[in-house]
Amino acid sequence: MAMKRNPSRVFCAYSKNGTHRSAAPTTHRCIAGGGRGALDAGAENTQGHPESRCFPGGRPPQTGPSWCLGAAFRRAFLIDDAWRPLLEPELANPLTARLLAEYDRRCQTEEVLPPREDVFSWTRYCTPDDVRVVIIGQDPYHHPGQAHGLAFSVRADVPVPPSLRNVLAAVKNCYPDARMSGRGCLEKWARDGVLLLNTTLTVKRGAAASTSKLGWDRFVGGVVRRLAARRPGLVFMLWGAHAQNAIRPDPRQHYVLKFSHPSPLSKVPFGTCQHFLAANRYLETRDIMPITVV
């Protein structure tokens, strides 16, 4: 593709011969590889993509970073292939390209949690066909070292946050004789078929709800709708108004449990919640193995 000299900035990507086009100004940025770094005109672009194009003048179209489609997207976030049928319809939506472009831009200017490899970690613990219970959260913990891609859960070596402490108290209320580990890592739940999914998958360090308008809720909502259509008979635990408004499963097809949020500020003490016991009783009536939460 021929390019004329233009005094304005030119965003260019990988040209056919593997180098930036010499006609580009010396101050331009490359959108290949997620838009990272500026290269001089004619310099070799080692992170380019052979199908990318040069876009003269101003900013490139809102197509998202180069890893936002198909296999490249799954590799960038270490997404398990079993979730591909549920995720790929969202990738075809132009709004997802804008979401990922903004996510990538923010990653270059601020600390975004959890780390990229953990944003979709929930896809790696169980397949869609193994999910039996869905617990909906809001957004990740915003302090470093806490969030690892599972709603409410923290890493094993991190102190248990207040909301999660109340969730564990509810488990103890359902199973008084259970011996609790006292840790807040819920990976065992996830491997056992509990989908712990926030409606917003990222957050700026130290700023709760800072990415709530980014578009993750639309993306996550689409994935949950496809999962619900594919798997009738799921148990949904919706805690608080946010979860109950964000995700609306059909109660004729699923067992929908609602309660106040486990925050210590809630009027109704979450420790009295009987959802875990109710969920297992429901699963047993359908000859489905109950979940193990202790």
From Swiss-Prot:
Keyword Hydrolase (UniProt): yes
Enzyme class, first EC level, given as a word: hydrolase
One GO BP: base-excision repair, AP site formation via deaminated base removal
Transmembrane segments: none
Keywords: DNA damage, DNA repair, Host nucleus, Hydrolase
GO molecular function annotation: uracil DNA N-glycosylase activity
Pfam family of the protein (one): UDG
Residues annotated as the enzyme's active site: D139 (proton acceptor)
Record localization: Host nucleus
Gene Ontology, cellular component aspect: host cell nucleus
Catalytic reaction list: Hydrolyzes single-stranded DNA or mismatched double-stranded DNA and polynucleotides, releasing free uracil
CDD domains cross-referenced by the UniProt entry: UDG-F1-like
EC number: 3.2.2.27
Function: Excises uracil residues from the DNA which can arise as a result of misincorporation of dUMP residues by DNA polymerase or deamination of cytosines. Therefore may reduce deleterious uracil incorporation into the viral genome, particularly in terminally differentiated cells which lack DNA repair enzymes.
Assigned protein family: Belongs to the uracil-DNA glycosylase (UDG) superfamily. UNG family.
Listed name of the protein: Uracil-DNA glycosylase
Gene: UL2
